[in-house]
């Protein structure tokens, strides 16, 4: 990566953060879905983790009159911002989520640029497409329905890992995608598989092994969640 690329990355990052202050009011989020769901549920999740003293609490008394924590895994209860919130229990969860959402938005734009630079020497095209990412629905959902987009930087990082044939890094990125949004991980993994077949079809076995490792690493979240979904379907 050249000095010019590093300078461009810094400018894209600053522009992403500046856009948050320019296009939003005092709070990077709305009072409907964002606050009533994401902030409230995340705050309840971190308190459940603290009260039971484990990352895998079994019961949440704050929501739905009490319920299994895996009813809320759709929101990604093992996300880094929730775990950080459990450590920094005296910090407002709204502040933590806003900071994390801005970070994920910024990283999405930066990782998009880095990914594109692996394929073209035309810096202007890379900047233009990265700006399109910034101005797309990613910005909108970063302060509305955050689980729709908060996995995006990890998807770009997963594609970058495939390009570098670093399947250990891909396994880590894939696991983070699942922990952020298991609902969208299937689509992400299909994209990664298609990209691998396009770039390095002979490496498909390594990718398959990475997928198995991702399933095993995230089983503590996905298997109980699948059980809850099946039980709710029967009822």
Which residue stretches match the model-derived regions?
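Membrane-embedded transmembrane-helix bundle of lipid-linked glycan/lipid transferases
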Residues: 1-235
């Amino acid at each position: 990566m050249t000095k010019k690329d590093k300078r461009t990355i810094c400018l894209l990052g600053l522009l992403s953060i500046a856009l948050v202050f320019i296009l939003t009011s005092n709070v990077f989020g709305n009072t409907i879905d964002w606050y009533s769901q994401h902030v409230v549920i995340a705050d309840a999740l971190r308190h459940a983790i603290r009260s039971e003293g484990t990352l895998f609490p079994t019961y949440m008394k704050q929501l739905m009159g009490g319920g299994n924590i895996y009813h809320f895994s759709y929101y990604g209860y093992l996300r880094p911002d929730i775990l950080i919130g459990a450590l920094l229990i005296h910090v407002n969860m709204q502040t933590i989520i806003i900071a994390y959402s801005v970070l994920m938005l910024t990283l999405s734009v930066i990782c998009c640029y880095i990914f594109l630079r692996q394929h073209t020497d035309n810096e202007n095209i890379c900047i233009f497409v990265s700006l399109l990412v910034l101005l797309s629905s990613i910005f909108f959902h970063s302060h509305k329905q955050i689980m729709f987009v908060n996995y995006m930087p990890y998807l770009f990082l997963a594609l970058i890992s495939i390009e570098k044939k670093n399947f250990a890094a891909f396994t880590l990125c894939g696991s983070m995608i699942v922990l952020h949004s298991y609902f969208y991980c299937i689509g992400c993994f299909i994209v990664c598989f298609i990209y691998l077949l396009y770039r390095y079809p002979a490496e498909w076995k390594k990718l398959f092994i990475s997928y198995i490792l991702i399933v095993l690493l995230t089983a503590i979240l996905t298997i109980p969640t699948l059980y809850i979904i099946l039980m709710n379907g029967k009822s």
